[in-house]
Amino acid sequence: MSLYIGLMSGTSMDGIDAALLELPSNHLIHGITKQYSDDVRRNLDDLIMGNHLTLASICQLNTLIGREFAEAVRQLLSEIKVHPKEIQAIGSHGQTVCHDTSGNIPYTLQLGCGHTISSLTGITVVADFRTRDLVNGGQGAPFAPLYHQQIFSKVNESVAVVNIGGIANVTFIAKNQMTRGWDIGPGNCLMDAWIYKNKGALFDKSGVWASQGEVIYPLLEYLLQDPFFHLDSPKSIGKEYFSLSWLQKHLKPDYTPADIQATLLALTAHTIAETILNESGEIKQLYLCGGGAHNTHLKENLARLLPGIAVKSIAELGISPDYLEAMMFAWLAAQTINQIPVNLTSITGAKGIAILGAVYPIIKSY
């Protein structure tokens, strides 16, 4: 038995998820979510929305996020009375602030200094996972299908897993076939940004506000024409693309805020449903994870759009929908530490197998 910690803050930026994972059983021992401090959250919002930050401010933010990730580790271990020396390594995703693979020079950047995390926790850290995939010819995202494949390794039927974070991504798993996956489009990011702008809330709990509005179908149809939705897979996208500025250029003065929220939820539901239906009726089970798995109104919309397909939370399998991505980065850290390459060729379009991440080691004294 080996213990690894995974750290994840997704494009929703709703906090740092920390998961203590037992391998090789993939058993989640404990998980917590630590909210970002107000200053860090404000600076992240400014950076991702394209507001001006100095280079010095970005460098400081990299260190500050590293400190907050380290504090999440300390809180996690304190709650269950586990000593840092018992942990083999931490897998830290960091906080994505930009990700674009559309040009001749693809790039991705996750903040959260690995040296800071390792020094403050006394635990070896693996970070900067996505850059290796980009260099290897891949899209750098999504990685979730790798871990979904582990969970459904004994699958006897075709299933789909959709992770609904800020960006939604899909995994298709079938017996005796290569696992496939890609980014679908906006998951929670537009709904979160819109409710924050109008109500000051971080997210629309259970989709209640969206349920009070009416879908603006001309707006929905216009949004669905965005070129990203019509790209062939593999494909990936960042939250900075599907931003409020992307939305607001399509809005009219007579649209009500609640109706816009209803339309944004419909956009997420329709793009997910279309992705599933394009699998030619093979899929009979759809499992949801990420924050969107708790959005009751979104799940109801998906069930309506996907007749004959059981739409479930991955919690029905005894797996936490909130900590699945953090668990994945704990697992990825173990692959890196043990020099085990991963195969993303059918997911990100990478040219071959690779060992992901950069290692920030700590010399343990016993």
Swiss-Prot record:
<dbReference type="GO" id="GO:0097175">
    <property type="term" value="P:1,6-anhydro-N-acetyl-beta-muramic acid catabolic process"/>
</dbReference>
<comment type="pathway">
    <text>Amino-sugar metabolism; 1,6-anhydro-N-acetylmuramate degradation.</text>
</comment>
<dbReference type="GO" id="GO:0009254">
    <property type="term" value="P:peptidoglycan turnover"/>
</dbReference>
<dbReference type="InterPro" id="IPR005338">
    <property type="entry name" value="Anhydro_N_Ac-Mur_kinase"/>
</dbReference>
<dbReference type="InterPro" id="IPR043129">
    <property type="entry name" value="ATPase_NBD"/>
</dbReference>
<dbReference type="GO" id="GO:0005524">
    <property type="term" value="F:ATP binding"/>
</dbReference>
<comment type="pathway">
    <text>Cell wall biogenesis; peptidoglycan recycling.</text>
</comment>
<dbReference type="GO" id="GO:0006040">
    <property type="term" value="P:amino sugar metabolic process"/>
</dbReference>
<keyword id="KW-0547">Nucleotide-binding</keyword>
<dbReference type="Pfam" id="PF03702">
    <property type="entry name" value="AnmK"/>
</dbReference>
<dbReference type="GO" id="GO:0016773">
    <property type="term" value="F:phosphotransferase activity, alcohol group as acceptor"/>
</dbReference>
<keyword id="KW-0119">Carbohydrate metabolism</keyword>
<keyword id="KW-0808">Transferase</keyword>
<comment type="similarity">
    <text>Belongs to the anhydro-N-acetylmuramic acid kinase family.</text>
</comment>
<keyword id="KW-0418">Kinase</keyword>
<protein>
    <recommendedName>
        <fullName>Anhydro-N-acetylmuramic acid kinase</fullName>
        <ecNumber>2.7.1.170</ecNumber>
    </recommendedName>
</protein>
<feature type="binding site">
    <location>
        <begin position="10"/>
        <end position="17"/>
    </location>
    <ligand>
        <name>ATP</name>
    </ligand>
</feature>
<keyword id="KW-0067">ATP-binding</keyword>
<comment type="function">
    <text>Catalyzes the specific phosphorylation of 1,6-anhydro-N-acetylmuramic acid (anhMurNAc) with the simultaneous cleavage of the 1,6-anhydro ring, generating MurNAc-6-P. Is required for the utilization of anhMurNAc either imported from the medium or derived from its own cell wall murein, and thus plays a role in cell wall recycling.</text>
</comment>
<dbReference type="GO" id="GO:0016301">
    <property type="term" value="F:kinase activity"/>
</dbReference>
